[in-house]
Amino acid sequence: MAPVKTPNQNLLQQTAPNKVKVILLKLVKRQIFIPIAALLILVIFNLIADPSFFTISLSQSSSGDPVLSGYLITILDNASELVILAIGMTLVTAASGGQDISVGAAIAISGSVVLRVLCGTDSRPEMLHAPIIVAFLACCIVAMLFGAFNGALVAFFKIQPMVATLILFTAGRSIAAWINNNELPIISDAKFGYFGNFIPGIPIPTPVFIAIACMIIIALVMKFTNLGLYTQSVGINAYSSRLNGINPAFIKFITYVILGLCVAVAGFIKVSRFSTINYSVVAKDIEMDAILAVALGGNALSGGRFNITASVLGAYVIQFLTTTLYKFNVLSSALPAYKAVVVILLVVLSAPVVREKLARLTKKLMLAKTAKEAV
């Protein structure tokens, strides 16, 4: 004899699906839906194509220490610089309604400054010419000055962001080479390599921790200051913001300075990874990936409302996609084409109009299902 269901059991069975439907509808409308959906698609694809993609194992670093290895670790590690840049690029985009296309060249400059401070005029120094902290501070100051230069052109001279940053985009790598007299110094100090690789005894790459630290810092700044509110206000309507006592020019300027600081951190990691940099190719096209991360996060490239968490997820989506393509032996020369097709689809799906239509379609399907169940 079949067990008789009580009214409470029937109520619970009806309530649970309704809660799931409500959550799903809310998620579809949320800005963070697209990067989460993209990550899930990539995860499912790799699970079907090759489940070993998610294997994490212990291996030995070059110094003989046990470290974690696997594609997931590679994604977290290699995405670190992009995540840091995506944070700054989100603020710049929200405030100015434009993007900074010079971050790749600025990374080359900041890395060149690190090499100059630590190596001096010696291309193969046996010992560092200055403490590492001094090199990092010098790198930050120079990168923030270049950020201030871009910010001044945009905020005070009213030049379009892409045109203003095109100056440094064009000249930046030549400046980086000039700083070290067209030489490529190599840093042999083991401790300096900790920042871009592994710290002995810690099996997770150091850049992962640096990226997390940057996320925590920007989250605290957003929570305990009005920077986020002012940035959003200026991006939505600069004139109204001025009437409310906000200085739009200063807010735009400060976001470029913050992006400069993010560039400095990314440049420092780049140099630490390889003990040197090639000025002409280091961080090449990373500005495009940073802009795509912002777009994939559902942020309007015309400025206004923004979500840094969504941009960070967008950065991880891009790196996940890149690693997946390499995993399946896609030629590096063909990688941009594959990447562009997938990114175009994701960007179209992240458009507010498309998201609204998806939400309506989801709602209709759920209502139809509910009506069918009722019958």
List the model feature ranges, each with a label.
Residues 1-48, 55, 236-239, 243-250, ...:
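Cytosolic-side transmembrane-helix boundaries in multi-pass membrane proteins
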Residues 34-48, 89, 139-143, 169-174, ...:
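Hydrophobic core segments of alpha-helical transmembrane domains in multi-pass membrane transport
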Residues 46-47, 68-121, 154-159, 294, ...:
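Single transmembrane alpha-helix segments in multi-pass membrane proteins
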Residues 157, 161-224, 251-254, 273-283, ...:
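Transmembrane helix-bundle core of multi-pass membrane transporters
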